A protein has these predicted regions:
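Short S/T/G/P-rich N-terminal loop/turn motif that feeds into the first structured element of a domain
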Residues: 1-50, 54-69, 75-92
Length: 92
């Protein structure tokens, strides 16, 4: 069953540093190993990132791998985080 993470920032989000994170972490044009989908975008009060993973282990591995780089780039922690096993994941 797929696993979803939802990260929400309620303040200004440093998209320039987020793009640098993706460039330094690997191929920005491809999804990381185990990631099935990613949606990133600004909202009126900050930003949202939603990712769908093959498993919670894939999501954790990605998070653990990139935590030092996130700290180095001083990307603030999200205001809210939700993580859950999906009951339905469909794509076209």
């Amino acid at each position: 069953m797929a696993f979803c993470t939802l990260l929400e920032w309620e303040a200004d989000f440093p998209f320039d540093r987020y793009h640098e994170l993706n460039e330094r972490a690997g191929d920005h044009s491809a999804l990381p190993e185990g990631c099935l989908a990613r949606v990133v975008g600004p909202v009126e009060t900050g930003a949202r990132i939603m990712e769908v993973w093959q498993s919670d282990a894939d999501a954790k591995r990605f998070s653990d791998k990139n935590s030092p780089l996130i700290a180095e780039l001083q990307i603030p922690p999200p205001s809210r985080v939700a993580a859950f096993e999906t009951s339905i994941f469909q794509t076209r």
